[in-house]
């Protein structure tokens, strides 16, 4: 499989470019850009800004956002359109 290039645009100067936390990481960490801490009540939903926009190289590519391991079981928090 050939490597692909994903172009990105910084929309907020506070944004962090996704990065792999360890050499064995399966995916890069994506961070929120918030003006103040966010608290969600049970069943409340919210869009969480990252301060980034991405451009995939073509229709054969997809970008997926996964919750961190244990986030749902430990905190009852999951993504509305999450995988799994």
Indicate where each model-derived feature is located.
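DUTPase catalytic domain/fold
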Residues: 1-84
């Amino acid at each position: 499989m050939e490597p692909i290039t994903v172009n990105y645009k910084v929309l907020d100067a506070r944004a962090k470019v996704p990065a792999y936390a360890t050499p064995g990481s399966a995916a890069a960490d994506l961070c929120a850009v918030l003006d103040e801490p966010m608290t969600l009540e049970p069943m409340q939903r919210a869009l969480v800004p990252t301060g980034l926009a991405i451009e995939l190289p073509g229709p054969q590519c997809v970008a997926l956002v996964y919750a961190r391991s244990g986030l749902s079981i430990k905190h009852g928090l999951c993504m509305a359109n999450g995988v799994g």
